[in-house]
Amino acid sequence: LQTKLFTDNSGKRYPDFYHAESKIVLDAKYKCLERATKVSDVERNDIHQVISYMHVLSSNIGGLLYPSKAESSTTLIQSTLKGYGGTMILFPIHIPVVDNWNDFIQQIKVTETRLINDLIPILRN
């Protein structure tokens, strides 16, 4: 989805995931965020990027997807924004480390299913 930040249609941006019905916007980061214990621990530019998406898309929920070493990491870190409000969430995604492509495909499907199962309750709210 191409998003434009300004009324003159300038400032093109591309969030990685946007669900229009539930107004949730997510961006994938290929960085180690596992040490974060709250959203504000994340690099400021990454937070500002998601807040910008949330504001322009009138979204109440925004988040960052990030790689995790833990196989079953489903701990979602959430923080509520001041001002217009909204919730930011950090979503850990297990990226399998395997010896061959077929094993990777099988294991990443499990990871994708976990992500979808974690997102469903949020999308329904």
Show which residues each predicted segment covers:
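Catalytic core segments in nucleotide and nucleic-acid processing enzymes
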Residues: 1-125
